[in-house]
């Protein structure tokens, strides 16, 4: 069985992914809370990605899969965003991920088959108003992932998932009533917004041996929003 580490897995996409992986893998979840995990076959490590240093002594010597799930959605007009907000988004989405990866690099190298899955946003490829901060932070993730995939091939693979708006606690303020849900669904060519399972299933595929010839790619799991013009 593979050892897979999820940073953030108590809610949303991370929780859906943990449920998907638990039966055929050893799943380790590092997150602030173990809420929602009691009935799952996973190991939990208390960890706050914004402040803590990951305790590798509580992890196996070999890590075969790594997923970094913390994210932010700060949508504001550019003129009203303070530089500190850009820095905070970059810190959470990119810098903290880099810190964790450098911490567990020996365990990833020990695997000889490790897979890394990172998260971007549809707003990187498709310019959207009010997305300057999140697009900048997630753009850093995409560039980093491709460079890392090149540097460490064939030791391990690195891929990115770029979702559109997905029904998770992080996106609740954008989907918390029927009107918002209808408008969001209408914006997508497939006429619905994403669900956590839509994204989790792609992540599970990228962590599996079924994707063994895929690396350095960005997958747009976004209901067609980034590429299809159907209206």
Sequence positions of predicted segments:
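Short, small/polar-rich loop/turn modules that mediate ligand/substrate recognition or access, typified
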Residues: 153-157, 214-216
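N-terminal Rossmann NAD(P)H-binding glycine-rich loop of SDR-like oxidoreductase domains
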Residues: 10, 14, 18
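Catalytic Tyr-X3-Lys loop
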Residues: 72, 79-101, 117, 134, ...
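Catalytic loop of short-chain dehydrogenase/reductase
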Residues: 117-140, 145-153, 165-166
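Short C-terminal tail/terminal secondary-structure segment
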Residues: 215-231
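A conserved structural motif in NAD(P)-dependent oxidoreductases
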Residues: 188-199
């Amino acid at each position: 069985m593979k050892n897979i580490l999820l940073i953030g897995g108590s809610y949303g996409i991370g929780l859906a992914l943990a449920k998907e992986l638990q039966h055929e893998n050893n799943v380790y979840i590092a997150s602030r809370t173990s809420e929602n995990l009691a009935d799952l076959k996973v190991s939990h490590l208390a960890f706050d990605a914004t402040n803590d240093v990951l305790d590798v002594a509580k992890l196996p010597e070999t890590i075969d899969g790594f997923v970094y799930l913390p994210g932010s959605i700060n949508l504001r007009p550019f003129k009203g965003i303070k530089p500190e907000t850009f820095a905070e988004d970059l810190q959470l989405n990119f810098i903290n991920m880099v810190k964790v990866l450098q911490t567990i690099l020996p365990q990833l190298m020990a695997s000889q088959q490790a897979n890394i899955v990172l998260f971007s946003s549809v707003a990187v490829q498709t310019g959207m108003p009010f997305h300057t901060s999140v697009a900048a932070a997630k753009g850093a993730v995409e560039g980093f992932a491709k460079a890392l995939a090149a540097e460490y091939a064939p030791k391990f693979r690195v891929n990115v998932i770029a979702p559109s708006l997905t029904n998770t606690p992080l996106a609740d303020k954008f989907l918390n009533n029927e009107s918002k849900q209808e408008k969001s669904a209408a914006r997508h060519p497939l006429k619905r917004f994403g669900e956590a399972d839509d994204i989790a299933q792609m992540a599970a595929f990228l962590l599996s041996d079924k994707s063994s010839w895929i690396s350095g790619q960005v997958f747009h799991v976004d209901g067609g929003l980034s590429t299809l013009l159907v209206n």
